[in-house]
Amino acid sequence: MANIYRDRVLNQVTEADIDSTLRVAGWVENIRDHGGVSFIDLRDMYGVLQVVIRDPELLKGIKKEECISVSGIIEKRDEETYNPKIQSGTIELDAKEINVLGQVYTTLPFEVMTSKEVREDVRLKYRYLDLRNQKVKDNILFRSQVISFLRQKMTEMGFVEIQTPILCASSPEGARDYIVPSRKYKGKFYALPQAPQQYKQLLMVSGFDKYFQVAPCFRDEDARADRSPGEFYQLDFEMSFATQEDVFRVGEEVLSATFEKFAPEGFKVTKAPYPIISYKQAMLEFGSDKPDLRNPLRIIDVTDFFQKCTFKPFIGKTVRAIKVHAEMSKGFHEKLLKFATSIGMGGLGYLEVLEDKSYKGPIDKFIPDELKEEFRSLAGLEVGDTIFFMADKEDRAAYYAGMIRTELGEKLDLIEKDAYRFCYVNDFPMFEKDPETKQIGFTHNPFSMPQGGLEALNEKDPLEILAYQYDIVCNGVELSSGAVRNHDMQIMVKAFEIAGYDEEVLKSKFGALYNAFQFGAPPHAGMAPGIDRMIMLLTNEENIREVIAFPMSGTAQDLMCGAPNEVTEQQLREVHIKVRD
């Protein structure tokens, strides 16, 4: 749309405009002086156009990153000066008039074109400059395209987009709440939602069949490379009269469509149906409940076998093993041992299978000769294989094995490249025991339906009860968690009772659900894939903050606007707050 600042955006200026007079606007990306003739690379959100300045008076006082409007005549470039890197690389604008729209008053803190090389805290302080960098900006524009597609896809699948409240009641859902004091009700607080969990379930009780939203979620958690502190966004959806398998099909359809559309060229995407791996199987074979299926290595359990051997460090412990077919130097083993000790292991035993099918390695002498063939069969060993061992308590052995599996996959270059490998992990334990207090608590979402229903809750050991809970994992990154919800009041009361909450606590903490479930709640289920993590994977960024327009720092600070900040004594009094030293 033409106006007083520009006739069109830069990617709309083409060879068809040659000899035309145009006005364009943008930022001064670069200034080059070629002795009597100067050039400006003018940048807007859509592209870059070279501006030729033959009158030095036009350039006087103009600095990099100033916002300017330029009018002039579009010309064909000399063929030897074509720039194939930009869309307008065969044309340029011969400037006749330049107006400064937004002046640069102080020294730039960094070069915009190389801002990704600058320290992160400086980038975040001047994020509005960092976002002028084409790669940084492209991530945010890409995010917009993905979210638009997700909305379109969910709508096509019959889901209705509904916004749920941002100010809600605090409830014990796992992470710490961000709380907001009430001015009107002294001593009472709102909380920012960790997820729209209760509201989306209440929508199902209200008779909405399929709900979704691009939901902001707020959790007072520490940052990680794949977790932004403060807030994040998820594609939250819920379905009435739905089973676990129904949710799986929806998750597969929307994620497959999204990744197939937006994956970099040449990348492979898992076809539906996705593999389904139980939590128990995942912890055994992958040493993690977030298995990376690009890594071909698998972990096996050899605990029972080694209880028949004489190697004391393995006696009475869980023993896991990883078989690898690759040549490894002495230096490789030394580096792997160093890694093993860095994660807390006391050592790293191994065996190599030689040409005559005998073993070489520090553990060989502890395996009786009459058991060696049994072990070869158990582990599926072939000539040229090396098998590594991890032994400890079950949870530590699984952790160590998972870490060694990942290290081997990376260092031996076994990880499948250019691929997005999805799977579901399901059958999570419903309850867990706190190692310090010994109290039974929920492992995951407290609103999940236990497998076996009320009968299981009444008759089984709580630690043996599984829940209809599931995660979607892609390349070792948890994209989503979800569950079949517990919509039966009797089952819910009993489940909370086992976790140490009596019915009165259930009424007070989750009163809306408790009351709503008195009035004919339908069976329902859902999940919520993380949008930030999706885009992080699709852009191949290692840090989630690279795909968020205005992220907090790793220390949960907004370095640009200064949050969290102090407020006035008057503001504190209005909400009945006194800050303690």
Label the model's feature ranges.
Residues 1-581:
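Class II aminoacyl-tRNA synthetase catalytic cores and aaRS-like
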